Amino acid sequence: MLNSHNRTEERSTEDIILEPYTYLISQPGKDIRAKLISAFDLWLHVPKDVLCVINKIIGMLHNASLMIDDVQDDSDLRRGVPVAHHIYGVPQTINTANYVIFLALQEVMKLNIPSMMQVCTEELINLHRGQGIELYWRDSLTCPTEEEYIDMVNNKTSGLLRLAVRLMQAASESDIDYTPLVNIIGIHFQVRDDYMNLQSTSYTNNKGFCEDLTEGKFSFPIIHAIRKDPSNRQLLNIISQKPTSIEVKKYALEVIRKAGSFEYVREFLRQKEAESLKEIKRLGGNPLLEKYIETIRVEATND
């Protein structure tokens, strides 16, 4: 029978260091960013070998950021299975995530396009600024304004997609700047995610029931509900408790519904969809992006 020392020797150091990351990517995500990269390539015509590397870089950065997010949010589930740090511990998970970020930067350097490193640095700074202010709001129980929240989303959620498109632009002969469209799509993506977290059965199966409430997160519908009636502190108090009780979360959903926040969010999303389609048309049309917008529309529910 092999002892633990021998088993370690049979695996490479690289495999050991990457194990939390390998665990995460073994559970496939929605891969929306890869689909969007393909869609933007209809315009940018990036050389296939370079596009393959950009896809790899964005995938690495995305999954590394999820591992860190799950630690910072004290999450239980990711893609329907236990989060990496519940299997491998916080120290190893953080080290692995940081390691993967630097491996991704190494891939950028291999492409030997000087402007790409500057783009990566700028967007990784944006990502950490967005994450930092969101953590501050949660931990200090400070409810941001909608404008502050959208600014955070532009840094955090739009940042990775913007990084992908800016890397593609650096490798493309096109001189058209597509980042304004990317920002609209990124905002729509995050606000839709906030809505679905509180309303979708599939999100419950993958991340848990109304996980944003348990995380104490000021998401877009929660911000609207709190600011609609500042004198009613019930929702703010519930958020501060980071509830795990299903009944408490159901009550919070009722408070949000009565504030008209779900309908408000749906209207906001419809506006962003219209803005996206208008910008796509201005840029010459793109059937893949138009199809993407069509498939992510949020239909009205009975609330």
UniProtKB/Swiss-Prot annotation:
**Keyword set includes Cytoplasm:** yes
Q: Which cofactors does this gene product need?
A: Mg(2+)
Which residues bind Mg(2+) 1 per the record?
A: 69, 73
In short, the EC number is: 2.5.1.-, 2.5.1.1, 2.5.1.29, 2.5.1.10
Q: Name one GO cellular component term.
A: cytoplasm
Coiled coil regions, renumbered to chain: none
Biological process (GO) annotations? carotenoid biosynthetic process; farnesyl diphosphate biosynthetic process; geranyl diphosphate biosynthetic process; geranylgeranyl diphosphate biosynthetic process; isoprenoid metabolic process
Cofactor note, please? Binds 2 Mg(2+) ions per subunit.
Question: Listed GO molecular functions?
Answer: (2E,6E)-farnesyl diphosphate synthase activity; dimethylallyltranstransferase activity; geranylgeranyl diphosphate synthase activity; metal ion binding
Q: What does this protein do?
A: Catalyzes the trans-addition of the three molecules of IPP onto DMAPP to form geranylgeranyl pyrophosphate.
Q: What is this protein called?
A: Geranylgeranyl pyrophosphate synthase
**What is the scientific name of the source organism?**
Mucor circinelloides f. lusitanicus
Q: Which gene encodes it?
A: carG
